[in-house]
């Protein structure tokens, strides 16, 4: 190798080292941030209340169907074929309605969860962007099973994000 080539490699490596030293990385746990903000806790409670109400309604319908089925079992021997078929169809119809109601309730709960958490996520992202710009972070990663395998606790911005969110009510 010529002297100029070696000098070029040496100079270029020196130039790139300071650039690497200026990279500032942080991460957040978005799920934790959502769950631990005051708004997130309220959303969780509202969601649990809605879920428990729907669950109670479904449990009552399930108990009614179970009672219908038990009554049918007790009386089926005394029924003629037409009455037995009619009662079985009635039980099947009620079971189908129950399953539709359960599926609808699940979809409503999922929609409500999205509706409650989306504004929180939007505000968290905005606050995070402010923190990252103000403190000159190069990149902020979201902690999840597949993205951040390990990182120093010092670069975890989650608690700061939660505090900033709750202070901006």
What are these regions (language model features)?
Residues 1-2:
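N-terminal hydrophobic targeting signals that begin at the initiator methionine
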Residues 17, 166-169:
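Generic C-terminal helix-cap and adjacent flexible tail
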Residues 22-148, 167-168:
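Amphipathic alpha-helical segments
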Residues 149-153:
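Short, exposed beta-strand-loop hairpins at the edges of beta-sheets
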């Amino acid at each position: 190798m010529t002297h100029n080539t070696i000098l070029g490699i040496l100079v270029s490596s020196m130039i790139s080292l300071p650039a690497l030293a200026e990279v500032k990385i942080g991460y957040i746990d978005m799920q934790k941030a959502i769950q631990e903000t005051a708004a997130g806790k309220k959303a969780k409670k509202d969601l649990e209340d809605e879920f428990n109400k729907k669950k109670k309604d479904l449990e009552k319908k399930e108990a009614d169907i179970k009672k219908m089925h038990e009554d049918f079992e007790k009386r089926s021997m005394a029924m003629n074929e037409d009455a037995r078929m009619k009662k079985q169809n009635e039980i099947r119809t009620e079971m189908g309605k129950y399953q539709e109601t359960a599926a609808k309730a699940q979809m409503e709960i999922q929609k409500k969860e999205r509706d409650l958490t989306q504004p929180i996520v939007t505000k968290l992202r905005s606050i995070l962007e402010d923190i990252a710009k103000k403190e000159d972070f190069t990149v902020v990663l979201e902690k999840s099973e597949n993205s951040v395998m390990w990182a120093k606790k010092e670069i975890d911005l989650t608690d700061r994000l939660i505090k900033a969110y709750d202070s901006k009510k």
